[in-house]
Amino acid sequence: MKIDLNSDMGEGFGPYRLCDDEAMMKIVSSANIACGFHGGDPDTMARMVRLAKANGVGIGAHPGLPDRAGFGRREIPFQPDELRQQMLYQLGALMAIAGAEGMKVGHFSFHAAMGNMVNRDPVLADLMMNAIATVDPRLVVFVTPESEIERAAKRAGLKTLALFLADRAYDAEGRLVARGLPGALVKDETSVRARVRRFLTHGQVEAIDGTIIAMPAHSILVHSDTPGSLELARIIRSEIEASGATLAPAAEHAA
């Protein structure tokens, strides 16, 4: 079995660093690179691409809303076509920078509020996925299982890779618990290890209310801004290796 381990990276800008990207890049198999709106800038994007190339890590675009102060986690009521252009602008920027460094963008992962907005609107999801397919039909789209984005990506002929968020709680319906609610963030090392082990062994996760739910995913995400994210990523990687699974970038094992 192949498993991808990924993290959102390059989300600082200028002299500001959100996490130790250099250390994280030595642990993950895929990097979701911020594209300049919620985080990142041209120099940071180029640095992330070079780090990924040096470490044999696959790269993906991680576009968000133009809201640095809110880190792209606040919804802004843009028109659908405006959102489409914002997404394409960011994707195109990373593709150009990657190409100049001899790398290809292999996957795509929405950031926070932009993804939430797309995921609850099937018309918007189709608009976005069709645009991505026109730019590069080989891109792999990170999705939540049974989501609008997953369905739209498949309608557009794009490959998908389902995500398990190791540091976020799920409800009994398989939805992420809103960040503002108690228990939404899972940062305890023992809890993360147990969650990942259950996922790798049984394809399941324990929801916040204790319900055991199916988690049909092949990629594990740890957020770089989660407290202790580096150690959590090391724990997750060790569990993947101990399970006998092969660590592989997203583009190598999408459905």
From Swiss-Prot:
A Gene Ontology molecular function term of the record: ATP binding
Report the HAMAP family cross-referenced here.
PxpA
Role played:
Catalyzes the cleavage of 5-oxoproline to form L-glutamate coupled to the hydrolysis of ATP to ADP and inorganic phosphate.
Q: What reaction does this catalyse?
A: 5-oxo-L-proline + ATP + 2 H2O = L-glutamate + ADP + phosphate + H(+)
- Enumerate the UniProt keywords alphabetically: ATP-binding, Hydrolase, Nucleotide-binding
Q: Does the keyword Nuclease apply?
A: no
**Under what name is this protein listed?**
5-oxoprolinase subunit A 2
InterPro entries recorded for this chain? Answer: Glyco_hydro/deAcase_b/a-brl, LamB/YcsF/PxpA-like
The annotated subunit structure for this chain is: Forms a complex composed of PxpA, PxpB and PxpC.
Family (UniProt) = Belongs to the LamB/PxpA family.
EC number(s) from the headed UniProt entry: 3.5.2.9
What high-level taxonomic lineage is stated for the organism? Bacteria, Pseudomonadati, Pseudomonadota, Alphaproteobacteria, Hyphomicrobiales
Top-level division of the source organism's lineage: Bacteria
**Could you confirm whether the keyword ATP-binding appears in this record?**
yes
Q: Name one GO biological process term.
A: carbohydrate metabolic process
SUPFAM superfamilies attached here?
Glycoside hydrolase/deacetylase (SSF88713)
